[in-house]
Structure formats: C-alpha cells, structure tokens
C-alpha cells in the first residue's frame, strides 16, 4: 500500500465540486498541464466528483487517468462519494444519504 502524504510542499491546485462535469474537468486539467511548474505541483481533488452532472463515471475515469500520468494527485472524499459508498454497501451510512433510487434511475 502506498503511503499517504501528510504534508504537501510546493505549488498546489485544488479542484472541487466537479459533479460529473467532464468537459469542464478536461479543460481544467489541460490548463494545469500548461503550467511551467506542473511537474512539481500537487493536484488535490476536494470531493464531489460524482452525482448531479451528466457523466460522474467519466469524471472518476479522468481522475484515474490523471493519477497514472501525474504522481502528485490526491482525492479527498466528499459527501457525495460517501453517499455513493454507503449506497453500494462499502461503508455504513445513515439513511438520509441513501441515493440508491436516484442513482439507479439517473445513471
């Protein structure tokens, strides 16, 4: 298992609340790639890649692709990821975050 950094040094880009908006996420990643310090820049996703938008699976795939291309990427789970994990039975979750019907019908 890879160690999880507890301290980040150097430049940081923070991305949050993507909500399945893959075209916007692609544009953000393309803009970051143009930065002269990208090789040492951390890219931190602060949650909510999924839910609401048109392509939550695509947003997760873009994140996974970025992890393969750039060694300084991390993702903090947001409430929507926790709700999804609870709905899938991966974690215990309170009833109020059960989006099973909504996700099954929408996605």
State the predicted function of each range.
Residues 39, 52-107:
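Active-site neighborhood of divalent metal-dependent phosphoester bond hydrolases
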Residues 1-62:
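N-terminal active-site segment of His-dependent metallophosphoesterases
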């Amino acid at each position: 298992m890879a160690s999880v950094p507890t301290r980040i040094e150097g430049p940081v880009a923070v991305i949050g609340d993507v909500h399945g908006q893959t075209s916007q996420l692609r544009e953000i990643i393309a803009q970051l790639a143009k930065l002269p310090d990208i090789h040492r820049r951390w890219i931190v996703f602060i949650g909510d890649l999924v839910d609401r938008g048109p392509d939550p699976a695509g947003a997760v795939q873009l994140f996974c692709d970025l992890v393969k291309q750039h060694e300084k990427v991390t993702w903090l789970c947001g409430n929507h990821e926790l709700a999804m994990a609870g709905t899938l039975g991966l974690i215990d979750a309170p009833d109020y975050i059960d989006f099973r019907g909504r996700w099954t019908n929408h996605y």
